[in-house]
């Protein structure tokens, strides 16, 4: 009780003073009573592309053991060792080939399901990871980064396949021109949500941009990303939440969301969706081969919704 009140007081003080809210992933998880946790293991040495695919499908709980564009990933030596205790461990590298854009043109995608007891139905989840980009990384117009997905349709709510409240939802991270960051989500858009200046909706089945430009990625170093999703409850109420922390500083926090209108929709796990200078034409294409890198992937969950 004391810790919960202390956390509430800290947030209130920060709001009054205009200070940024800063917290470690574990502290955020604790404040929302996310008591179940796990991490995704990494190998002890670099692996070839084929060995990387074998390692991931045997060591990570990947849905249907399927990795889209698996030829673009491998475990390599950390290009930006930070002096941390795990800096000598390999990191997961994703390659974007010269001229690539959109699906099938560089990057990788899969879902790591998380169901510790076999019948767990998470209503809240926090995912954290570190991501780095080549020093000379050209952001072009944008690309997608991992986040959280849920619902019975494990392959929906991406690529223009819309959310209807009973099939699925996804919340991912995106970079835009110059490394500007945002949350990019497929969920329901109740009346007036799209009139909110913090949301940019699309009527063609694609996702919604949330708080675009509220933070920025920096190339040539590690960036800590932490995403919290809490599903709406009751089902017909837009009180779901997404929060995004960049380098442990709160950048986005929206709690007027409707992820679902059916109790068939709950949180499945980690959506590794590192796509490809995501766009529909060659103006999104990377002019040279570049890479992103990932390490220290952790998750916390709870069966309690918002």
Listing of model-derived features with the role each one plays in the protein:
Residues 1-23:
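Fungal secretory targeting signals
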């Amino acid at each position: 009780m004391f810790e919960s009140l202390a956390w509430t007081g800290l947030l209130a003080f920060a709001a009054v003073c205009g200070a940024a809210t800063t917290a470690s992933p574990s502290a955020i998880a604790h404040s929302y009573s996310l008591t179940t946790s796990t991490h995704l293991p990494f190998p002890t040495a670099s692996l070839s592309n084929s060995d990387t695919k074998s390692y991931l499908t045997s060591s990570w709980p990947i849905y249907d053991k399927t990795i889209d564009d698996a030829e673009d990933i491998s475990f390599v030596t950390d290009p930006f060792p930070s002096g941390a205790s795990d800096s000598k461990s390999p990191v997961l590298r994703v390659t974007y080939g010269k001229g690539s854009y959109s699906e099938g043109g560089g990057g990788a995608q899969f879902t790591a399901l998380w169901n510790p007891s076999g019948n767990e139905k998470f209503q809240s989840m926090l995912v954290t990871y570190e991501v780095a980009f080549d020093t000379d990384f050209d952001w072009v117009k944008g690309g997608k980064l991992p986040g959280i997905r849920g619902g019975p349709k494990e392959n929906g709510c991406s690529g223009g396949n819309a959310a209807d409240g009973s099939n699925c939802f996804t919340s991912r991270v995106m970079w835009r021109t110059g490394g500007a960051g945002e949350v990019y989500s497929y969920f329901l858009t109740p009346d007036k949500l799209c009139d909110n200046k913090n949301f940019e909706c699309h009527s063609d089945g694609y996702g919604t941009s949330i708080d675009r430009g509220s933070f920025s990625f920096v190339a040539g170093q590690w960036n800590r990303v932490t995403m919290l999703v809490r599903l709406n409850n009751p089902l017909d109420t837009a009180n779901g939440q997404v929060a995004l922390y960049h380098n442990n500083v709160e950048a986005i926090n929206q709690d007027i969301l409707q992820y679902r209108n059916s109790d068939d929709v709950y949180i499945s796990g980690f959506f590794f969706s590192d796509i490809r200078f995501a766009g529909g034409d060659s103006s999104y294409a990377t002019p040279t081969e570049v890479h992103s890198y990932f390490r220290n992937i952790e998750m916390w969950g709870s069966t309690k919704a918002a």
